[in-house]
């Protein structure tokens, strides 16, 4: 491999750029707005909601599958809709953001475009300063899928970052207080009924954090874990369907983070769900239909899922067989799981949305994310690994111009940001594809300090900068 010891680096950098085998493509191919993103099916399967560009801003479009009609719900000209989610069979929640500054707002609207509710006003921030002084700081804790009229939110009134819990009506916007913050809880974990059962508590600038737990709505809060903020990870991820077993991600006693089952009553680990010596575990995947945790996501050479539930593993295998060579994610599903939406994408393809009937096992194409991109004209992103001078194994990705001999190519080394925490991943990257289209080889290295490879790998980058 040409990058094994960088022996050809000087030659590559001094070589002139030759004409690419594929045509030079317009900038819009790489950097124009996607034609569609975040396609979501309603719980009953009647509606499809998506984001599409209108007025050079991302707006909401809803398709009524029963009536065969299509309707644009928003007409943003200054702001972008950045995320959507179904709150019940016919009501959609969405977040709004203004370009050029950090900002947020949360709204709900009917699938026919009626009854717009402002669940959280648009709040503009400049750095850490709130520009328009909101009455409250607001965060969504649980969408309460079994309560079609309400969501669970955290609202801070007067205490920085420390919110109390409220049930909010998604039509009237009204709040009903559910619980006062038991201390300094900054984030919550609910069980599968929507009851807050775990909280991560930390005082301002305190060196330690506590994980609090309660057995039920009337039970006292008890501390089940205490750890240093800059120490080993111990993160509660969510409950299983029995609302007793807690899943936690931790790297205690190891370098990479693993996922375990945990008994919060006995306060002990009960089993290992996923552990890898090279890569950190990601998050758990919960199936509302099966009412259990079914898998674990993680970032290896390519994004992957470790399935622990046989039914889901078989379904994923069938999908991958129908769409080979792609990253195939189930991004939305009906409540009964009879219909699922798949986003199928790769290093050369920004993606296509498919609809799968899981009863008949029939797959149909819905929409491509970006019609301007021809995957055949894009370059492959190859996972690579090599040892540094001190013997540390490094991982990365090499992208070579499509249709070119891998000889005499100018090389761009494109490091990710950070330096600690982020990493590069196998995906469609417009910037990398643009450079490859212009005739450059591009090397992305997950250098020491990058995230996803365990604590020791990140710590190997400490005091190595400047």
What are these regions (language model features)?
Residues 1-4:
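N-terminal secretory signal peptides that target proteins for export/translocation
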Residues 372-466:
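Cap/lid segment of the alpha/beta-hydrolase catalytic domain
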Residues 57, 256, 350, 363, ...:
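Internal amphipathic alpha-helical segments of the cytochrome P450 catalytic fold
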Residues 183, 277, 370-372, 401-402:
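A short acidic/small-residue loop/turn micro-motif
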Residues 349-384:
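An N-terminal hydrophobic leader/cap segment in hydrolases
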Residues 24, 67, 218, 360, ...:
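A generic, residue-level signal for flexible/boundary positions that often mark functional hotspots
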Residues 8, 12-15, 20-340, 345-349, ...:
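Beta-propeller folds
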């Amino acid at each position: 491999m040409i990058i094994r010891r960088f022996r050809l680096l000087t030659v590559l950098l001094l070589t002139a750029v030759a004409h690419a085998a594929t045509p030079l493509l317009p900038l819009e191919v790489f950097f124009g707005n996607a034609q569609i993103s975040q396609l979501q099916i309603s719980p009953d399967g009647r509606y499809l909601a998506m984001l599409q560009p209108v007025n050079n801003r991302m707006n909401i479009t809803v398709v009524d599958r029963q009536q065969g009609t299509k309707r644009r719900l928003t007409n943003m000209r200054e702001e972008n809709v950045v995320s959507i989610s179904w709150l019940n069979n016919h009501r959609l929640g969405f977040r709004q953001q203004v370009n050029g500054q950090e900002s947020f707002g949360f709204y709900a609207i009917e699938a026919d475009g009626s009854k717009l509710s402002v669940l959280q006003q648009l709040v503009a921030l400049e750095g850490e300063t709130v520009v328009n002084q909101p009455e409250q700081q607001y965060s969504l804790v649980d969408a309460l899928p079994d309560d079609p009229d309400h969501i669970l939110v955290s609202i801070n009134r007067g205490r920085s970052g420390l919110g109390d819990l409220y049930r909010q009506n998604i039509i009237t916007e009204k709040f009903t207080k559910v619980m006062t913050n038991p201390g300094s809880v900054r984030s919550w974990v609910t069980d599968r009924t929507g009851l807050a059962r775990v909280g991560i508590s930390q005082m301002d600038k305190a060196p330690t954090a506590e994980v609090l737990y309660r057995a039920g709505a009337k039970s006292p809060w008890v501390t089940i874990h205490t750890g240093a903020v800059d120490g080993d990870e111990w993160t509660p991820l969510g409950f299983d369907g029995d609302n007793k077993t807690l899943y936690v991600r931790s790297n205690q006693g190891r370098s990479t983070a693993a996922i375990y089952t945990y008994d919060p009553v006995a306060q002990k680990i009960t089993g290992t769900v996923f552990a890898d010596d090279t890569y950190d575990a990601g998050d758990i995947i919960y199936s509302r239909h099966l009412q259990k945790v079914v898998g674990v996501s993680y970032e290896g050479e390519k994004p992957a899922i470790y399935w622990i539930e046989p039914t889901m593993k078989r379904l994923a295998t069938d999908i991958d067989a129908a769409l080979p060579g792609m990253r195939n994610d189930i991004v939305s599903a009906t409540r009964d799981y009879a219909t699922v939406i798949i986003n199928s994408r790769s290093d050369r393809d920004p993606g296509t949305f498919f609809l799968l009937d899981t009863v008949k096992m029939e797959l149909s194409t819905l929409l491509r994310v970006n019609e301007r991109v021809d995957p055949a004209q894009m370059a492959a992103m190859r996972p690579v690994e090599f040892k540094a001078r001190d013997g540390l194994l490094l991982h990365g990705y090499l992208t070579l111009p499509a249709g070119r001999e891998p000889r005499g190519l100018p090389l761009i080394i494109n490091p990710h940001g950070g330096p600690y925490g982020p990493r590069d991943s196998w995906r469609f990257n417009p910037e990398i594809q643009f450079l490859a289209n212009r005739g450059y080889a591009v090397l992305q290295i997950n250098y020491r300090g990058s995230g996803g490879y365990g604590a020791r790998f990140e710590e190997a980058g400490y005091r190595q900068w400047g």
